[in-house]
Amino acid sequence: MCSGGIMKIRYAKKSEKEIAIKFWKDSFKDSEEQIKFYFDNIYNEKNYLVLEDNSKIVSSLHENDYIFNFNNESIKSKYIVGVSSDIAMRNKGYMSKLLISMLENSKKKAMPFVFLTPINPKIYRKFGFEYFSNIEYYNFSIEELANFKLPNNEYSYLEINDKNKKLYLKDLIKVYNSNMEDKFCYLERDNFYFDKILKEAISDEMKIFILYKNKVASAYIIFGLYEENIEIRECLALNSISYKEILALIYGYRDYYKNVSLASPNNSNLEFLFENQLNIEKIVKPFMMLRILDPLAIFKNLKLENSNIKIYIEDKILKENTGLYS
């Protein structure tokens, strides 16, 4: 019970999409295009968890399905986004109840963990979330690319757009996987997921190119052009030579754009592609937070069964997790 009413947590009905859109608009600074993209391509009422008080939706969140590769094992998980409460109903504890319900729910569905990208990590630490990954940003003058050359042998740079994108999904996934196979954890991308990434980039008016050398997909880049800056959302290659060759494409914009900002997965160490590391500003920021729901599943995944480790866990929210694990 709360504010004299009856509270209920449930998944949304088909007819409640407009409510979801209004909550999003009231709570986040996304542009109309970004909101339209999300609700046209990603939103699913079956994953939209709402809290009702007196039959009125007062708080909500979205649980989007993802497959995580965690220590070489594919794990079904949920990426939590759009956690928000009615503007007039904030600070009444609705969001806490909703988040706790989501955690209990996900545990019942045998998920070892859920994850999110926080606007404010302090809020989510109260619920047992903690950072587990970083993202790297590299800022440099476009002139730093002056020595990056195009390939010498048979090659082509192909621009990917809405009409042809399906033709390149398999090759994009190959380049992505070759970069991820040595990582401890990463999001798995299938055709459906990669198609969504390309759709979002196209909706954000970004450009996408893939580099073929001797008919083999060797690198791809997703970037946007803004005033004096080029922002590279994602750039991956089979090796450092192909990485330089895809960045050589960016140098073609030097007459119009002065600076480049490049986002990259943790431990990319891209500064070593350049001749002078001191000219490259590298910023490492915490990226995603994770909440463990099933400690035993995680210990199994970490292959800790045979090691002589004893761990005591106190979980104030999922109390059944509290105990000594050995």
Question: Whereabouts are the PLM-identified features?
Answer:
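Intrinsically disordered, low-complexity, positively biased terminal segments
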Residues: 2-3, 18, 154-326
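Conserved acetyl-CoA pyrophosphate-binding loop and the N-cap/start of the following alpha-helix
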Residues: 89-101, 111, 241-245
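Short amphipathic alpha-helix that is part of the acyltransferase structural core
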Residues: 2-60, 64-65, 72-79, 146-191, ...
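Conserved catalytic-core motifs of GNAT/GCN5-like acyltransferases
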Residues: 68, 117, 130-147
